[in-house]
Amino acid sequence: MPRRTDLNHVLVIGSGPIVIGQACEFDYAGTQACRVLRAEGLQVSLVNSNPATIMTDPEFADHTYVEPITPAFVERVIVQQAERGNRIDALLATLGGQTALNTAVALYENGVLERYGVELIGADFEAIQRGEDRQRFKDLVAKVGGESARSKVCFTMDEVRETVEDLGLPVVVRPSFTMGGLGSGMAHSDEEVGRMAGAGLVASPSANVLIEESVYGWKEFELELMRDGHDSVVVVCSIENVDPMGVHTGDSVTVAPAMTLTDWEYQRMRDLGIAILREVGVDTGGCNIQFAINPHDGRLIVIEMNPRVSRSSALASKATGFPIAKIAVKLAVGYTLDEILNDITKETPACFEPALDYVVVKAPRFAFEKFPGADPTLTTTMKSVGEAMSLGRNFVEALGKVMRSLETGRFGFWTAPDPQGDVDQVLLRLKTPTEGRLYDVELALRLGASTEKVAQVSGIDPWFVAQIGELVKLRDELVAAPVLDAELLRRAKHNGLSDRQITALRPELLGEDGVRSLRKRLGIHPVYKTVDTCAAEFEAKTPYHYSSYELDPAAETEVVPQTEKPKVLILGSGPNRIGQGIEFDYSCVHAAITLSHNGFETVMVNCNPETVSTDYDTADRLYFEPLTFEDVLEVFYAEEQSAAGGAGVAGVIVQLGGQTPLGLAQRLADAGVPIVGTSPEAIDLAEDRGAFGDVLTAAGLPAPKYGTATTFAQARRIAAEIGYPVLVRPSYVLGGRGMEIVYDEETLKDYITRATALSHEHPVLVDRFLEDAVEIDVDALCDGTEVYIGGVMEHIEEAGIHSGDSACALPPVTLGRSDLEKVRQATEAIARGIGVVGLLNVQYALKEDVLYVLEANPRASRTVPFVSKATAIPLAKACARIMLGSSISQLRFEGMLAASGDGGNVASHAPIAVKEAVLPFNRLRRADGAAIDSLLGPEMKSTGEVMGIDHDFGRAFAKSQTAAYGSLPTQGTVFVSVANRDKRLLVFPVKRLADLGFHVIATEGTAEMLRRKGIPCDEVRKHFEPPKAGRPALSAVDAIRAGDVDMVINTPYGNSGPRIDGYEIRSAAVSVNIPCVTTVQGASAAVQGIEAGIRGDIGVRSLQELHSAIGAGIAADNEVQ
């Protein structure tokens, strides 16, 4: 069946910012979708608010709209294209997660799609409703002979209470049409039911929740299926959760293929899955179905279905080599499975189900260390911020690799001191699912607990527990063996142990280098296998590799050189985490693409299954491997050996993947690996405060006074000399980890006690904190001689809030020409002083006309994608070319960089782009269910970002807020409670809100000040202030929780008593999902955004149009000059 000829123009909706529950797997899916559609000759319009994605690069669509993903904005795109005579024929929403699906449903229900003749493809409206609506799906499962958990859909709290009485406690609360289990949880008491169901009714777009019987402790499985228009169905992959029901699948360690299913259970699950897929009506695409099995009686029930490409779809794609998103798009435009060729084998059609002769393990990455108040218990609400995946020939080999891929400071079992406690305490901990529970499984077994006991208390299947038990036996052998011989060492490596783990057990081997030397002498090295989708039945034509240590010494590697071109290894960024996310993958992908087009064979090394970089056709060759020194070095050796007289490895790129590869640079260089671009010595120079200070002194550049301390006494002396407040942090961190503003000696002592434990090898840095300064971010390129300013960003929040959490504007809004000239001169001096070859990010603070240098990072920054989208300059591609020998003047001549000028010169009429951070406060809760504090500071907390771009700042800021958190209010009530130091500065923005018609309420002190300034204001009492006669009865928190407040402005009070009241105010705002502004500058920006919203003239423009306008502006400026 050929492609549909009635489709000419398809609209693709992305998933928006990276949030917990919806990450960069949808950039991977969306990028594939755009590639396929354009390859089929279709015109593509794309809507996605996330500038850090590959899919929003202008070359992936004909019309790229970096706009909020809301029904209103998507409708504007549809209308704009129709008015231009370029009507959109179809909407593909099954590749953008829950955000895209919910937006498509709203557009259908509002009549927009019918009005403009737009067809839903991939899954129609009825299929989405049947798959997503809890009650309809439950009825459908029963119709095909399946069973669901006993449950009822409830629309009111009265219905909830009746259902709980019928089912009995505990129950599971699941809101409809939400992602990542948002709002769901296990309720063990009536109080918990009330809290969770109340929150769930708010979280659900359809305002209903499913109350179902608890199946906590059951085994959980998933199937990935695809169906075409001829009713052919393939089961792509089965996935088993190591953690039992009760832990969200995104937070569980998962294994593919499923390990513990009987043949009867698998066949029953498969038959049910196919029947459900057909009954739901997903006839041109893929879906994910989750099942649970009672381990005691074998009862099998269907949990839920995603009638779209999901997080698990990305995992299944990378696990099998079967490109689910790509094939889903081909099915959506009319092809059938038998007409689509397998990209890996180039012979078999897509109707051949994948077969695996290896095991895949995925493990989640958490960020609880960033949120000390958050409850670390794993529940049905997803909390992980990223994940890693590994492949091995057996389960324990893959498990060992994935554990060291997570970069948590532990490199697998036995690489960190065991927590204190006896076996009973460890078993008690295992009853509550937490981040490190597999370590407790191993420890319990080592302390003498039986496999059965550990399985019983943890709910983990005995097979998985027994596999870890085999590792415990192997550990005992390694410790007891008089000599580490070839057979034992080979077995250790075959079972996934790293050199680091082995040296922890055998310290006489003198570290990793000693273990590696011993392996080499004994001829023990990894072989590299190929992911081929067919268990070696057909030859793989696509080089997608993983390592394994085979027991057979004669086993051979399957890596073969693709060309005689020189090879470049690109080290990715590993699992997403706060501080190191999709922005770095963006730069790695750009490097692979541009170097492949410029005479190099590109080799990607990464372990993140969500990313575009680990798509098998991004680089010329892919290694799905941990980003550790040992694993990267072995890949380098394999590539060198495979050259066989041809071109070897020209170099390894470490400066694009964030801190992870940077941390490997010096050791790799010492091992003889060529590092291209900025040298490891220059990287270290930028991190060494003393050496970097010398660079600044030579250039005559001021920096905040600072000192380096390794003891509290030293830190106290430095702080006394500098003057409080001071900024303290450990060296060599990303995302501001461990960074705090300290106001007094007592707090400093507390910090030093914690921070030195955080970083043993590097000292603590103590800086003067510049209050009320304007922070500036600069991304620049340097070829060793010439410097090219990519972009200058002005932070909206003041210095002291981490740059990754602060909104910023490009071009700067308040900086003058003289300020920009200071920035240029300082950046050029720093780039040359360090010796940068490639990208450089510098952060400045401007205070009283003095430009202070805060820090310089000779690497790609998280703002590179944003700057590239805002300026139309591909900084990451240019960086890759520069690192491999091109000059800036050459790139100007080729047209990759502007022929004259750069991002330090703002073109006339340039649009304003605003980047806003997206924070996970609605996901992470305290143990009592209360929201964690939304206050920002020097430690980064955001998971993702959005971009708003328009003609002026107000419109651009309004778009950024809509994309990140929902529209700013244009009427209603604003609550104001601010610290004394901020009251004078907040008078103007609050007066403007009152003039716009807002009702202002405030606590006593703030209300008195506002009334003195002529601003009408009603008073409410503080949360912890008892009601008094003649005083307001209503507290601020009561008003917020009652829904009587539309926006909160609350700046922190420092360490004084009112700080607790501020927490209650901010957490209440998070709970009811209203804007909560915590800085003066943020309030001023919000007012400008609200004014733009009231005017109502916010339109949409594609990046292609905006970039054309930028080019025209630059040309006009050049003519004037």
Swiss-Prot record:
Q: Which residues bind Mn(2+) 4?
A: E855, N857
The UniProt entry, under Gene3D superfamilies, shows: 3.40.50.20, ATP-grasp fold, A domain, ATP-grasp fold, B domain, Carbamoyl-phosphate synthetase, large subunit oligomerisation domain, Methylglyoxal synthase-like domain
Q: What is known of its domains?
A: The large subunit is composed of 2 ATP-grasp domains that are involved in binding the 2 ATP molecules needed for carbamoyl phosphate synthesis. The N-terminal ATP-grasp domain (referred to as the carboxyphosphate synthetic component) catalyzes the ATP-dependent phosphorylation of hydrogencarbonate to carboxyphosphate and the subsequent nucleophilic attack by ammonia to form a carbamate intermediate.
A single GO cellular-component term from the record reads: cytoplasm
Where Mn(2+) 3 binds, per the record, is at: Q843, E855
Q: Give all residue intervals belonging to the MGS-like domain.
A: 966-1113
Can you name this protein?
Answer: Carbamoyl phosphate synthase large chain
Q: Any idea which positions bind ATP 2?
A: R729, R768, L770, E775, G800, I801, H802, S803, Q843, E855
Q: Which gene encodes it?
A: carB
Cofactor stoichiometry and binding remark? Binds 4 Mg(2+) or Mn(2+) ions per subunit.
Ranges for the region named Oligomerization domain are 408-559
* Residues that bind ATP 1: R134, R174, G180, G181, E213, V215, E220, G246, V247, H248, Q290, E304
Which InterPro entries does its entry note?
Answer: ATP-grasp, ATP_grasp_subdomain_1, CarbamoylP_synth_lsu, CarbamoylP_synth_lsu_oligo, CarbamoylP_synth_lsu_oligo_sf, CbamoylP_synth_lsu-like_ATP-bd, CbamoylP_synth_lsu_CPSase_dom, MGS-like_dom
| Positions bound to Mg(2+) 4 | E855, N857
Q: Which residues bind Mn(2+) 1?
A: Q290, E304
In residue numbers, the region (Carbamoyl phosphate synthetic domain) covers 560-965
What's the subunit arrangement here? Composed of two chains; the small (or glutamine) chain promotes the hydrolysis of glutamine to ammonia, which is used by the large (or ammonia) chain to synthesize carbamoyl phosphate. Tetramer of heterodimers (alpha,beta)4.
**Where along this sequence does the record place binding of Mg(2+) 3?**
Q843, E855
* Metabolic or biological pathway: Amino-acid biosynthesis; L-arginine biosynthesis; carbamoyl phosphate from bicarbonate: step 1/1; Pyrimidine metabolism; UMP biosynthesis via de novo pathway; (S)-dihydroorotate from bicarbonate: step 1/3
Q: What is the lineage of its organism?
A: Bacteria, Bacillati, Actinomycetota, Actinomycetes, Mycobacteriales
